[in-house]
């Protein structure tokens, strides 16, 4: 199959049965392999969707600068879309995130600004605050803001969930989704609940994260969620 751009290869990721882990369980376990997306993660979907929707709304145009605070995966999806569509891209990212992510982002043409991992989101040195500061300083720059942009859950409501329904129909009892911005779990859960009202939706959250509502709030090593 021939595509006009790499962006058209985003989505329609394969689903693979997990045989070893679930062999002693009275159920079938499947994994949707989002690492098959060209940028390497599920966040390619929202990077492309946020850019497309902002263009259609007349909010951005090629040549502008896109700035995004991210743990890296959304940054890779956004940098990929920016490279194809002709935007400059600046990614603000905590120092905790892997050097490999920075290498990929730079290969896609993005400029990387590292920030202290321990900085709270409200701190002037945080990746969110630094992104806002850069947006004020750079002409024709925009923060598409994965944290509050409706295009984030919409990408999963319109595409990811539909792919799951195409593969499983109503023969699905539970879906487990990691939680970062909440866009994936929100969009997928909304659509699946419409089609399969009794489906159970489980959010995977690291120990120490505030999102799951646990008693123990502490630092953790896992990147991109929590």
Model regions and ranges:
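PLP-dependent amino-acid enzyme catalytic core
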Residues: 1-226
């Amino acid at each position: 199959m021939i595509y006009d751009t790499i962006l058209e290869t985003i989505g329609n990721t394969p689903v693979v049965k997990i045989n070893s882990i679930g062999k002693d369980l009275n159920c079938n376990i499947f994994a949707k392999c989002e690492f098959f997306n060209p940028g390497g993660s599920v966040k390619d979907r929202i990077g492309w969707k946020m850019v497309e929707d902002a263009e259609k709304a007349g909010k951005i145009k090629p040549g502008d600068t896109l700035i995004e605070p991210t743990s890296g995966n959304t940054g890779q999806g956004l940098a990929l879309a920016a490279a194809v569509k002709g935007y400059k891209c600046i990614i603000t990212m905590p120092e905790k995130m892997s050097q490999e992510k920075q290498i990929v982002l730079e290969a896609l043409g993005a400029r990387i600004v590292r920030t202290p991992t321990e900085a709270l989101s409200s701190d002037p040195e945080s990746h969110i605050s630094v992104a806002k500061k850069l947006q004020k300083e750079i002409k024709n720059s925009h923060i598409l803001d994965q944290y509050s942009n409706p295009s984030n859950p919409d990408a999963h409501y319109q595409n990811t969930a539909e792919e799951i329904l195409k593969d499983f129909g109503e023969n699905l009892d539970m879906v487990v989704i990691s939680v970062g911005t909440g866009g994936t779990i929100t969009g997928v859960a909304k659509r699946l609940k419409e089609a399969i009202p009794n489906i159970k939706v489980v959010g995977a959250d690291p120990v120490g994260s505030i999102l799951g509502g646990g008693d123990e709030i502490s630092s953790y090593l896992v990147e991109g969620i929590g």
